[in-house]
Every structure is written in C-alpha cells, then in structure tokens.
From Swiss-Prot:
It is found in: Secreted. The gene is IFNAH. This is Interferon alpha-H. Pfam families: Interferon. Produced by macrophages, IFN-alpha have antiviral activities. Interferon stimulates the production of two enzymes: a protein kinase and an oligoadenylate synthetase. Disulfide bonds join 24-122, 52-162. PANTHER family: INTERFERON ALPHA-5, TYPE I INTERFERON.
C-alpha cells in the first residue's frame, strides 16, 4: 500500500511541477520572442522613414491600455495577446504580402504565431485561476480601435509603401510599449 501512495504522490508532484512550469511567468518568457518580433519588424523596413514624413499620422496609440499603473499582470497578458493578435492579422493581409519581403514576413508571422500560442496558454491558466475574462472591455476596445485606425489608414493610402512604413513604425511602437510593460512586471517579481 505504501508504494502505491508514494507513486501517486510522486505523480502528483510531477504533474504540479509540469503545470507550474507552464505557469505564466510572462515577463521572463515573453520578452525574448517580443524582441525577436521587434528585430523582424526593423528588418522589414524598405522605405526610409524620412521619405515618409508627410505620411505620418497620429493613430492615438492606447498607451493607458499598456501603461496604466492599475494594470494587473493578468490584464497585461490579455492586452499583450490582443496587440499580438491584431498585429498578426495586419501582417497576414493580402496588402502586407505585396508590401514586404515574403521570407521576412513568414518569419514575422511565425514569431507572432508562437507568441499567440504562449499567450493563449497563459490566458487559459489565468482565467482558470480567476474564473472570469481578464481584459477590461474598455482596454480591449481601445486596442481594437487603434488597429482599426491603422487598417483604415492603409486602405485610405491604398497600401502604398510609405503608408506601410508608417504602420510598421506604429506596430514597433506598440511592441516596444509591451516590452516596457513586461520589464515593469519583471521588476515587481
């Protein structure tokens, strides 16, 4: 009887360890892939930003969604997921395929897809712990509206190279802000 209990206890401890290792220590696990996305976005640049100054636009990036002092780690994961998901969708359009080097674009989408998978696992875990959706509707809506403005801008500019350059720079700004958010949580941990 004792060996059976020992075996069950060992199995329980191993499964707890496996589950906890899937635990979302996002600031530690997400930062490196996020930097990879930033690197790929930099490499996508085809047009000099200085030649596109007349095309710049204020898209009203929802900084409060990523930088609010009241933002909890679980909500931050949701915001990061939302930003990553919309970025993936933006760079998966037909217009993006025409604007960028296909090989780099494939690498970017693969990196974003991996981030989405990791973030989704974190979201499921956090929602399981809390039993409720993590992202406040206003933060989610702010991120969606921001990416909608980017999409409308591209359509208005007929997906020209400068418009894509402006959008690429905007997305880099969003990912830089999310990296800063992760650093803030890393310092807290």
């Amino acid at each position: 009887m004792a060996p059976a209990w020992s075996f069950l206890l060992a199995l329980l401890l191993l499964s707890c360890n496996a589950i906890c290792s899937l635990g979302c220590h996002l600031p530690h696990t997400h930062s490196l892939p996020n930097r990879r996305v930033l690197t790929l976005l930099r490499q996508l640049r085809r047009v000099s930003p200085s030649s596109c100054l007349q095309d710049r636009n204020d898209f009203a990036f929802p900084q409060e969604a990523l930088g609010g002092s009241q933002l909890q780690k679980a909500q931050a994961i949701s915001v990061l997921h939302e930003v990553t998901q919309h970025t993936f969708q933006l760079f998966s359009t037909e217009g993006s395929a025409a604007a960028w080097d296909e090989s780099l674009l494939d690498k970017l989408r693969a990196a974003l897809d991996q981030q989405l998978t990791d973030l989704q696992a974190c979201l499921r875990q956090e929602e399981g712990l809390r039993g409720a959706p993590l992202l406040k509707e206003d933060a989610s809506l702010a991120v969606r509206k921001y990416f909608h403005r980017l999409t409308l801008y591209l359509r208005e500019k007929r997906h020209n190279p400068c418009a894509w350059e402006v959008v690429r720079a905007e997305v880099m700004r969003a990912f830089s802000s999310s990296t800063n958010l992760q650093e803030r949580f890393r310092r807290k941990d």
